[in-house]
Amino acid sequence: MLGKGGKRKFDEHEDGLEGKIVSPCDGPSKVSYTLQRQTIFNISLMKLYNHRPLTEPSLQKTVLINNMLRRIQEELKQEGSLRPMFTPSSQPTTEPSDSYREAPPAFSHLASPSSHPCDLGSTTPLEACLTPASLLEDDDDTFCTSQAMQPTAPTKLSPPALLPEKDSFSSALDEIEELCPTSTSTEAATAATDSVKGTSSEAGTQKLDGPQESRADDSKLMDSLPGNFEITTSTGFLTDLTLDDILFADIDTSMYDFDPCTSSSGTASKMAPVSADDLLKTLAPYSSQPVTPSQPFKMDLTELDHIMEVLVGS
């Protein structure tokens, strides 16, 4: 390998790296040529993808490496090789420079100790060890995926055991019946629980029973329920109760009743009673006419009609 800063020179009689494509006829010469080509290919990939993080890659070196990869690709096309698999070759005897002592991490998972790319005893062709440069330029992941030498048989996945639809449907019915049970759906609830515990045929026979048996089951179900649960099973649920009884049953509103006109007996014990004379005295400064304490506290309907006409007219 050339040192850092050294120029690459081409020898016309050298079997080749960048010149004419040599097609050797003998077996050992072909193996040596394939070894050289594989070594150059690996070194080119290493230089192309292993850059220092703080230095920018040189454009001239990148162009030379890409040209070398294109030449190897043209040779592979002329030889008619199929899509090869990339495997790193044996390390050269000369120690590389400091920049390329370690292999790039992108190709670390591709090293296979069992097979050598240019083993003489292997039955695979020698060109199958090389990867075209077009695959490298198009997608970096295509040449990183190594194909297995002996594909393993696909494992047969056992299909998951599917539960019958009736069981899931009956369990859903059970949940619904627990949330909102009614007297009309007790027959369906008993049939659903029986279908979960027993077979589907037994559930079908129970659904086809007469109305007398269903009424007997309803009575047994109502007897088995606790006393506080009987309120929820009635069809007239919340008909006798009002919203105030439910929401404001635990709230003592006697402390918050400040209206003197609507004071009840409970408020009279806690608040001082307000007479009509005191109320008229407090309302006297806001009235246009003088109000006497003996005047009855009432509203005239004609004044209300006049006020409504004024409001509608405005």
UniProtKB/Swiss-Prot annotation:
Amino acid composition bias (Low complexity), ranges on this chain: 182-193
Biased composition (Basic and acidic residues): 210-221
PTM comment text: Polyubiquitinated, which promotes proteasomal degradation.
Pfam families: SERTA (PF06031)
GO cellular component terms given for this protein: cytoplasm; cytosol; nucleoplasm; nucleus
Annotated region described as Disordered, given as residue ranges: 77-119, 181-222
Function, as annotated: Acts at E2F-responsive promoters as coregulator to integrate signals provided by PHD- and/or bromodomain-containing transcription factors. May act as coactivator as well as corepressor of E2F1-TFDP1 and E2F4-TFDP1 complexes on E2F consensus binding sites, which would activate or inhibit E2F-target genes expression. Modulates fat storage by down-regulating the expression of key genes involved in adipocyte lipolysis, thermogenesis and oxidative metabolism.
Protein name (database record): SERTA domain-containing protein 2
Organism, as annotated: Homo sapiens (Human)
Lineage of producing organism: Eukaryota, Metazoa, Chordata, Craniata, Vertebrata
